[in-house]
Amino acid sequence: MASSSSPPSAAEAASCADVAVVILNWNGAALLRRFLPSVLAHSNGARIIVADNASTDDSVAVLAQEFPQVSLIAHAANLGFCEGYNQALKQLAPDLRYAVLLNSDVAVTPGWLQPLRQLLEERPAVAAVQPKIRAQAEPEMLEYAGAGGGYLDRLGYPFCRGRLFDTLEPDHGQYDDARPVAWATGACMVVRLSVWHALNGLEPEFFAHMEEIDLCWRLWNAGHEVWYHGSSIVYHVGGGTLHKSNPRKTYLNFRNGLALVYKNTHASELAGTLATRLTLDWVAALRFLLQGETADARAILRAHRDFYRRLSYWKQKRRQYPPRLTQQRPGVYRGSLVWAYFGQGKRRFSELDARLLS
């Protein structure tokens, strides 16, 4: 949805010269052809880098022949989302201060990057910030992966302003503000590189899914802030990595969800939160069975098995990044999103009890 515009002035281009826009790619030649032009046109002097996860299509050839101005980091194997970015950002030039984690299926708009960088410049406590995410297919709608900024409920279930479970809101300007949130989307997130490296980037055990939520939770636990800036807008296709009903995605979401809560929840809240999550996971598995989706039900069982197998690892991570009380940070709904959505029929962020929002 990005529109064309005149090239940026020298002053505008220089303003983002300390930013690297890093696009992780795996067999996405068609997406690169479709979306790289908007990134090149509207990123105002930022360095554009594609980190390729050992693609077997013609992605590397497309970059060399059609986008020679784009730098390439070629991984020798498919490292997944987490390690793909971790290894790529380790190779960035030392003069860079910020990096954008940008999905290959995102179209950016004129002026998208400057407000995000400016917020980081003006607020040293902020370590990550995301723009407003709209849907590429339905430009008037907010998009699943990020929408108007990420929240968590008291059980650690993620949702967004503008997206409760699968229910999306149209964008009427209701989230045009700039404010702290619990998490920023990995579809388009600007990070402060000094903090990224200090916290060792994304959790490699996650491979993909919920990794940005874990990172942002660790940022808050370490005393940093995560923000949303609604004056910056990008358009996301979404669903480009794994199909929505893919058992592999079910496995990653449930396994990573347990690890996310275990790693980051304060000790005083952990036992009750984890017990409730485990119970709800079994309810979800039963629901899959009743619907005939046995592969997804088995995926939940494998997720639990593998979470427990790696429990000593997750314990070490808890010690490495000590959790804080959930209510001590913004972006938290101190109620149950499951109950609000399925029990009370709430479908919009504005319908949630404001007294329970931070």
Q: Where in the sequence are the language-model features?
A:
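A conserved acidic beta->alpha catalytic loop
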Residues: S38, D52-A61, A77
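A short, conserved alpha-helix in the catalytic core of glycosyltransferases
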Residues: D176-I233
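Glycine-rich, basic loop-to-helix element that forms the pyrophosphate-binding segment
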Residues: A74-L92, S104-V106
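Active-site-adjacent helix/loop segment of glycosyltransferases
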Residues: V22, A222-F342
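Short aromatic/hydrophobic "clamp" motif used to bind/position activated sugar donors
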Residues: A99
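Conserved donor NDP-sugar-binding/catalytic core segment of glycosyltransferases
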Residues: A107-G146, G150-Y157
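Short, acidic, metal-binding catalytic loop of nucleotide-sugar glycosyltransferases
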Residues: P37-A46
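Short beta-strand/loop segment that forms part of the nucleotide-sugar
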Residues: G45-A54, I73-H75
